[in-house]
Amino acid sequence: MHNLPTKATYVNTQGETIYLSHAGFTPRATEDGDLRWVWDEDLIWSRDHFLDAWPEDEMFKKAIVVHGHTPVPYLLEDIDPACRMGEVEPGALWYCDGHKVCVDAGAVFTGYCSLLNLDTWDEEVFSTEPYLT
């Protein structure tokens, strides 16, 4: 596990820049106009970015952060405290004006897992029940 990368960047077939990390983050630009990554530990564990506003820098206009770490039902409770776990449809959650997507369906709690095609944004949600026996 220690040798795995903590982040990756992918440009999809639509020309969108996708930043992937376990916990997600809000991108920021350096003074030179490059991406300023956050600390590796934050890319793995942080939940502090959920309510951040998306940066207005031109380089992030066609950028999307894809992450997991926090199951969608719990993330929704951070964004809207009126949401409750049992009321959430299984699948990915798009937020931050469509620039962030959490793909953690919370399989251990909900029994669902989601996959997201980074080129088409098609989502596949499936039940983990058949695999838990």
Would you name each region that the model predicts?
Residues 1-101, 106-111:
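Acidic, His/Gly-enriched loop-helix segments that form or flank divalent-metal centers
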Residues 12-14, 117-122:
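Short acidic-glycine loop/turn motifs at beta-strand connectors
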Residues 113-115:
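C-terminal regions of proteins
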Residues 123-127:
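Short hydrophobic/aromatic-rich beta-strand segments that constitute the beta-sheet cores
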Residues 128-133:
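Short, solvent-exposed aromatic-acidic interface loops
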